[in-house]
Amino acid sequence: MNSKNLAVIGECMIELSQKGADLSRGFGGDTLNTAVYIARQVPQQELNVHYVTALGTDSFSREMLQAWQQEQVKTDLIQQLDNKLPGLYVIETDDTGERTFYYWRNDAAARYWLDSPQAESLCAQLARFDYLYLSGISVAILPPASRVKLLALLRQCRANGGKVIFDNNYRPRLWQSQDETQQAYRDILSCTDIAFLTLDDEDLLWGKQPVEQVVSRTRDFGVSEIVIKRGADSCLVFSADGETEDVPAVKLPKEKVIDTTAAGDSFSAGYLAVRLTGGNAVSAAQRGHLTASTVIQYRGTIIPREAMPQ
């Protein structure tokens, strides 16, 4: 059996986490979390998981690459730019556990992956992939000219028989205006096959509406499979054939929930680990819930490998 190829497009940043006088360093990024959790759950004989971004030539970038390779995430499509560095963010946690995030990413390498001399040949490769996955953040960090190139890539991939998967992860501070975001999302959703939505992000971007209207709007853009993630509640899957599935979440005692940072990213990973290897939507959603419910029982976005559900 020929293994299929999935490219996950986005940005991973250096994470500094401060609690009191202690400062710990790690790496974080919504799409990177998803890539790692898919790679952990699908054998390479079935699916190759590639990460697509740009990094620097510094020691932090090299450390990232090594960490991802150890997770069986392929890094051969990642560009290293001489004069750029990864973005950086700091998480400050107060005495009540409330977290504040500070970002330094305006000139991060990931913003320029479509501007390099290699970008054209890279896009030609990606256009032949079976699946391309990206999030609202993957789009938000790009300059306008790069967004045009990204759209062209998504359209070409679909024209070649590939599928596009989009997570609506909306961060208002990364965009110039709501109008700009709405237009960008319209463009992306018009060439998306599977969309992961959270109602909080939808409400923030389009205004509060019932689920039925959210689904109707997304369908009108041309999306055939819509997955609505609802945290600790059941998720809703709206299939291309008009079927709707309401799949219960895994219930956890409150004291077991430690860190929900990567809950949505890991849900998407579990869902796709099943869906992209031939499983049905209900099995995929069940796996998504199982993955997310495991991840939130640990601190940090990437849990120990041995803690993964079987």
What are these model-derived regions, one by one?
Residues 1-4, 156, 211-310:
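Conserved phosphate-binding/catalytic region of the ribokinase-like
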Residues 1-74:
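Glycine-rich phosphate/adenosyl-contacting loop at the front of the ribokinase-like
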Residues 12, 168, 266:
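Active-site metal-binding loops of divalent metal-dependent hydrolases
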Residues 16, 46-136, 310:
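Conserved N-terminal subdomain of the carbohydrate kinase-like
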Residues 38, 198, 264:
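Short, conserved phosphate/pyrophosphate- and ester-handling motifs at nucleotide-, phospho-/glycolipid
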Residues 131-138, 164-171, 196-200:
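Short beta-strands and strand-loop turn motifs
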Residues 160, 172-246:
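Conserved phosphate/ATP/ADP-binding segment of small-molecule kinases
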